[in-house]
Amino acid sequence: MRDLVQESWLRGVYVSMQTMTDTRDRICEILRATGRPGMEAVINYLLTSSYFKRGCYGHHKEYGGLAQHSLEVYEHMLTHAEGYPADSIAVVGLFHDLGKTAKRDGRGHGRRSVVILDRLGFALTDEERTAIGRHHDRSLDLLTCPLRRHLTAADCTSTARWKHAHPELCHHHHRKVSQ
């Protein structure tokens, strides 16, 4: 039996297997607690896709970073998005980057997230659909979709915290061009 404190190494960041297991279990628990129809199909997708394994581009690069980032976004939204149902916060916070598990197809990862959820038969409210599908869309006024505003703030907060904790992984190395 593998030791659960075995370390996984990627790009200079250690993540314990126990941490990854805890993150997976916590996310599944939160999602099941929503009681939303179709949630088990989405959870099965998460468990069989790269959602719990992959990192993000530009932040949370470590193995399991995507799930960790999504959990951080959810937790931030839970404390700052007052007035929204807990199930909407869970769906938006935990599924906003789901599209990063799918092959690129010309759409942004937010829109791919919505497509995946649609294919799995998971129903979204109009506001959830807009928040997830357009969370990086600068052309959409943040005031027209308050849930998207909360998602964008939480997404930026999680990313900034990771970059602050791992500055050595955020430098862009530029090649010196000779003239």
Residue ranges, per PLM feature:
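Metal-dependent phosphohydrolase cores
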Residues: M1-Q179
